[in-house]
Design a protein with these regions (language model features):
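Hydrophobic alpha-helical segments of small multi-pass membrane proteins
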Residues: 71-75, 79, 102-106, 121-123, ...
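HotDog/MaoC-like acyl-thioester-processing domains
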Residues: 2-16, 111-112, 122-165
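Hydrophobic residues positioned within well-ordered beta-strands of beta-sheet architectures
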Residues: 54, 101-103, 117, 142-144, ...
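Short structured motifs
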Residues: 38-42, 101-107, 128-130
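Short connector loops at helix/strand junctions that flank enzyme active sites
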Residues: 37-39, 49, 98-102, 112-116, ...
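Hydrophobic beta-strand-centered segment that forms part of the acyl-chain substrate-binding groove
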Residues: 84-124
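Non-catalytic linker/capping segments at the edges of enzyme domains
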Residues: 1-55, 94
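Hot-dog-fold acyl-thioester-processing enzymes
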Residues: 57, 61-81, 95
């Protein structure tokens, strides 16, 4: 890889475009340590270019109608947003506690297979601005959008990061 290519790769990595396997493993361990999350079988499926993917099996998230329980859909989307913000903060070398402040969910269709969610920053959000605010104030907020594969459900939530220490 020539110098310009290596520089672009380093910039992309530092700006949170690529996953750090150790951060992903630590996030998964944190998720699994929460009894409700462990019971739901939620797993991080990957992170690339600012998008976090999360999955959960239908068989432990099924309702009386044979499709995914709405609460499970809400949980997977909320947790995918939480994990996205946590991952990107970790990639930026920041330690923070991340909380969901508020959210809105639209259920559009039943889900009859495994739950697959993707989370990304809302289009009007600027990650660099978020990091600048976080660095200056020790707290910042950012809006994340998540969706269940196929458009079955959509989530928009505001997450708050509070610096540790």
């Amino acid at each position: 890889m020539h110098y310009a290519g290596a520089f672009r790769f380093a910039c992309a990595y530092m700006s949170g475009h690529f996953a750090d396997p150790v951060l992903l493993e630590n996030l998964q361990r944190t998720l699994t340590a929460m009894p409700p999350v462990a019971a739901m079988g939620i797993r991080i499926a990957g992170y690339d270019n600012g998008v976090l993917r999360m999955q959960a099996p239908l068989d432990v998230n099924i309702n009386d109608k044979g499709n995914a329980f709405g609460g499970s859909l809400a949980s997977v989307m909320t947790l995918s947003g939480w994990a996205l913000v946590s991952m990107r903060l970790g990639l930026a070398g920041q330690q923070a506690e991340v909380y969901v402040a508020d959210s809105n969910i639209r259920y559009r269709a039943p889900v009859y297979g495994d739950l697959l969610a993707t989370a990304r920053l809302a289009p009007d959000q600027d990650w660099d601005e978020f990091l600048t605010t976080f660095s200056k104030r020790g707290r910042a907020r950012v809006t994340v959008r998540a969706a269940i594969e196929g458009g079955a459900a959509e989530f928009e939530g505001r997450f708050v990061a509070l610096g540790k220490g």
